[in-house]
A protein has these predicted regions:
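A short, structural motif
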Residues: 1-67, 74-86, 97-105, 117-125, ...
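Soluble extramembrane regions of membrane proteins in the secretory/endomembrane system
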Residues: 164-165, 169-172, 176
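Active-site substrate-binding loop specific to GH73 endo-beta-N-acetylglucosaminidase modules
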Residues: 147-152
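Amphipathic alpha-helical coiled-coil/leucine-zipper-like oligomerization segments
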Residues: 30, 72, 174-177
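Extended, hydrophobic alpha-helical segments in both membrane/secreted and soluble proteins
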Residues: 106-110
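Conserved catalytic-loop aspartate of Hanks-type protein kinases
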Residues: 128
Length: 182
């Protein structure tokens, strides 16, 4: 990475409203991710820009930038998608996933599964957001067709929530549907 690329990336970190201290926290991990993935650090769509968008969506503090880059790296290198695909999908699905109680790592993993099926970028984000929204609506309103579909499969809303009232992990949601359909 060049000094100009680092400066450009830090400009995007600043434009996102980060303080000097937050920019310091985020520069190293984001630059390392950019270097490892061979992507630009600065500029629109650079790693710094994508990271600030993702961290803002999940309200992740700058001190956790290394964890964020680890999660992004793991998702991108274990699925058929680029960092740009992942960030674009998170733009579409992140708010719904966060509201449903799923963190960045869980969201990235779900997007990775879709990426492996050739559903990438905004298409993956839209599909995931719709799935979560429809699942939540089906579980919340007994008058909806989705609720009837769940009960016809022998499933109830309680099957999809943990003891604290949060939606269970997506792999468990998929498993419940898979078992019900067999």
């Amino acid at each position: 990475l060049t000094a100009a690329d680092i400066a450009s990336g830090q400009r995007y970190l600043a434009m996102a409203g980060n303080t000097v201290e937050q920019i310091k926290d985020m520069t190293g991990p984001a630059a390392k991710l950019a270097s490892i993935l061979g992507q630009p650090f600065g500029g629109k769509g650079g790693v710094a820009d994508l990271m600030t968008n993702i961290m803002s969506m999940y309200v992740i503090p700058s001190q956790q930038a290394t964890k964020v880059t680890d999660d992004l790296y793991t998702a991108v290198t274990n699925a058929n998608m680029s960092l740009t695909d992942l960030a674009q999908a998170i733009t579409y699905a992140g708010a719904d996933m966060a509201n449903a109680g799923y963190d960045l790592r869980q969201t990235a993993a779900a997007i990775g599964v879709l990426g492996d099926m050739g559903i990438q970028g905004s298409s993956a984000g839209t599909a995931l957001a719709n799935m979560i929204r429809y699942l939540q609506l089906s579980l919340a309103d007994q008058k909806k067709k989705g609720f009837s579909a769940l009960t016809s499969l022998g499933l109830s809303p309680q099957d999809f929530f943990d003891a604290e009232g949060n939606l269970i992990r997506l792999d468990k949601v998929y498993r419940k549907f898979g078992e019900a359909l067999m």
